[in-house]
Amino acid sequence: MEPEVSLDSLLAQLATSPIAFGTDNPVNPALRADLEGALHAADVENLDPAGVVVLEQTPAHVADLRDLAQDLANSTDYGTVIVRTPQVAIGVSDHLNRVQIERGERAMVAEPDYADGLHAFARAADGVTVHWPLAVAVALLVLAGIAVAAAMTARR
Protein backbone atom coordinates (compact mmCIF):
# COMPACT_ATOMS: atom_id res chain seq x y z
CA MET A 1 0.00 0.00 0.00
CA GLU A 2 0.92 3.62 -0.20
CA PRO A 3 3.46 4.34 2.52
CA GLU A 4 1.49 7.34 3.76
CA VAL A 5 -1.80 5.41 4.12
CA SER A 6 -2.56 4.55 7.72
CA LEU A 7 -5.41 2.50 9.04
CA ASP A 8 -5.93 5.01 11.85
CA SER A 9 -6.26 7.89 9.38
CA LEU A 10 -8.79 6.00 7.27
CA LEU A 11 -10.76 4.98 10.37
CA ALA A 12 -10.83 8.59 11.58
CA GLN A 13 -12.14 9.74 8.22
CA LEU A 14 -14.76 6.98 8.09
CA ALA A 15 -15.94 7.97 11.56
CA THR A 16 -17.13 11.32 10.18
CA SER A 17 -17.95 10.48 6.56
CA PRO A 18 -18.61 7.38 4.46
CA ILE A 19 -15.72 8.46 2.19
CA ALA A 20 -12.01 8.28 3.07
CA PHE A 21 -8.89 9.14 1.10
CA GLY A 22 -5.41 7.70 1.36
CA THR A 23 -3.75 11.01 0.45
CA ASP A 24 -4.54 14.71 0.42
CA ASN A 25 -5.34 15.70 -3.12
CA PRO A 26 -6.94 18.89 -4.48
CA VAL A 27 -9.66 16.83 -6.19
CA ASN A 28 -10.75 15.09 -2.97
CA PRO A 29 -13.55 17.55 -2.01
CA ALA A 30 -15.23 17.29 -5.41
CA LEU A 31 -14.74 13.52 -5.51
CA ARG A 32 -16.13 13.23 -1.96
CA ALA A 33 -19.26 15.15 -3.01
CA ASP A 34 -19.74 12.93 -6.07
CA LEU A 35 -19.26 9.72 -4.09
CA GLU A 36 -21.53 10.84 -1.24
CA GLY A 37 -24.18 11.72 -3.82
CA ALA A 38 -23.80 8.28 -5.36
CA LEU A 39 -24.07 6.60 -1.94
CA HIS A 40 -27.35 8.42 -1.29
CA ALA A 41 -28.87 7.38 -4.63
CA ALA A 42 -31.72 4.89 -4.59
CA ASP A 43 -29.90 2.36 -6.79
CA VAL A 44 -27.10 2.04 -4.23
CA GLU A 45 -29.29 1.24 -1.21
CA ASN A 46 -28.38 -2.48 -1.42
CA LEU A 47 -24.88 -1.50 -0.24
CA ASP A 48 -26.16 0.47 2.74
CA PRO A 49 -24.43 1.22 4.99
CA ALA A 50 -21.32 1.55 2.84
CA GLY A 51 -17.93 3.15 3.22
CA VAL A 52 -15.67 3.94 0.28
CA VAL A 53 -11.89 4.36 0.47
CA VAL A 54 -10.04 6.00 -2.41
CA LEU A 55 -6.33 5.30 -2.82
CA GLU A 56 -4.14 6.81 -5.52
CA GLN A 57 -1.97 3.73 -6.04
CA THR A 58 -2.53 0.01 -6.23
CA PRO A 59 -0.16 -1.96 -3.98
CA ALA A 60 2.08 -4.67 -5.39
CA HIS A 61 -0.09 -7.24 -3.61
CA VAL A 62 -3.75 -6.57 -4.42
CA ALA A 63 -4.75 -8.90 -1.57
CA ASP A 64 -3.53 -6.16 0.77
CA LEU A 65 -6.53 -4.09 -0.36
CA ARG A 66 -8.95 -6.85 0.63
CA ASP A 67 -7.23 -7.07 4.01
CA LEU A 68 -7.53 -3.29 4.38
CA ALA A 69 -11.21 -3.37 3.43
CA GLN A 70 -11.87 -6.19 5.91
CA ASP A 71 -9.99 -4.40 8.70
CA LEU A 72 -12.02 -1.24 8.05
CA ALA A 73 -15.29 -3.18 7.95
CA ASN A 74 -14.42 -4.93 11.22
CA SER A 75 -13.60 -1.61 12.89
CA THR A 76 -16.59 0.42 11.68
CA ASP A 77 -20.36 0.09 11.41
CA TYR A 78 -20.28 -0.09 7.61
CA GLY A 79 -21.84 -3.26 6.25
CA THR A 80 -19.98 -2.85 2.97
CA VAL A 81 -16.52 -1.34 2.49
CA ILE A 82 -15.14 -0.70 -0.98
CA VAL A 83 -11.52 0.25 -1.64
CA ARG A 84 -10.95 1.87 -5.04
CA THR A 85 -7.65 2.56 -6.80
CA PRO A 86 -7.18 3.59 -10.43
CA GLN A 87 -6.72 -0.07 -11.43
CA VAL A 88 -8.67 -2.08 -8.86
CA ALA A 89 -11.93 -2.11 -6.91
CA ILE A 90 -12.11 -4.39 -3.88
CA GLY A 91 -15.12 -4.87 -1.64
CA VAL A 92 -16.10 -6.72 1.49
CA SER A 93 -19.60 -6.98 2.89
CA ASP A 94 -21.54 -8.62 5.66
CA HIS A 95 -24.72 -8.80 3.58
CA LEU A 96 -23.56 -9.32 -0.01
CA ASN A 97 -22.28 -12.73 -1.03
CA ARG A 98 -18.95 -13.32 -2.76
CA VAL A 99 -20.51 -13.55 -6.24
CA GLN A 100 -22.31 -10.24 -5.77
CA ILE A 101 -19.13 -8.56 -4.55
CA GLU A 102 -17.00 -9.88 -7.40
CA ARG A 103 -19.53 -8.83 -10.04
CA GLY A 104 -19.69 -5.42 -8.41
CA GLU A 105 -15.91 -5.11 -8.35
CA ARG A 106 -15.63 -5.89 -12.07
CA ALA A 107 -18.39 -3.44 -12.95
CA MET A 108 -16.91 -0.70 -10.79
CA VAL A 109 -13.37 -0.91 -12.12
CA ALA A 110 -14.72 -0.71 -15.69
CA GLU A 111 -15.98 2.81 -14.93
CA PRO A 112 -13.28 5.50 -14.93
CA ASP A 113 -15.61 7.86 -13.05
CA TYR A 114 -15.63 6.70 -9.43
CA ALA A 115 -19.21 7.79 -8.70
CA ASP A 116 -20.47 6.03 -11.83
CA GLY A 117 -18.42 3.05 -10.73
CA LEU A 118 -20.23 3.00 -7.40
CA HIS A 119 -23.58 2.90 -9.24
CA ALA A 120 -22.22 0.13 -11.48
CA PHE A 121 -21.06 -1.86 -8.42
CA ALA A 122 -24.52 -1.62 -6.86
CA ARG A 123 -26.35 -2.57 -10.07
CA ALA A 124 -24.08 -5.54 -10.72
CA ALA A 125 -24.28 -6.73 -7.11
CA ASP A 126 -28.05 -6.34 -7.09
CA GLY A 127 -28.41 -8.26 -10.34
CA VAL A 128 -27.16 -11.50 -8.79
CA THR A 129 -30.14 -13.24 -7.30
CA VAL A 130 -31.39 -16.77 -7.37
CA HIS A 131 -35.04 -16.95 -8.38
CA TRP A 132 -35.93 -19.83 -6.10
CA PRO A 133 -39.48 -20.46 -7.38
CA LEU A 134 -38.13 -20.78 -10.93
CA ALA A 135 -35.23 -22.98 -9.78
CA VAL A 136 -37.61 -25.28 -7.89
CA ALA A 137 -39.98 -25.45 -10.87
CA VAL A 138 -37.14 -26.40 -13.22
CA ALA A 139 -35.89 -29.03 -10.77
CA LEU A 140 -39.39 -30.51 -10.49
CA LEU A 141 -39.73 -30.61 -14.27
CA VAL A 142 -36.39 -32.39 -14.60
CA LEU A 143 -37.37 -34.90 -11.93
CA ALA A 144 -40.76 -35.46 -13.59
CA GLY A 145 -39.01 -36.03 -16.93
CA ILE A 146 -36.68 -38.56 -15.34
CA ALA A 147 -39.65 -40.34 -13.72
CA VAL A 148 -41.53 -40.51 -17.03
CA ALA A 149 -38.45 -41.81 -18.85
CA ALA A 150 -37.89 -44.44 -16.14
CA ALA A 151 -41.53 -45.53 -16.28
CA MET A 152 -41.43 -45.84 -20.07
CA THR A 153 -38.19 -47.84 -19.90
CA ALA A 154 -39.66 -50.16 -17.25
CA ARG A 155 -42.73 -50.91 -19.43
CA ARG A 156 -40.60 -52.18 -22.30
Map each language-model feature to its residues:
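A short, hydrophobic beta-strand-centered structural micro-motif
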Residues: 73-88
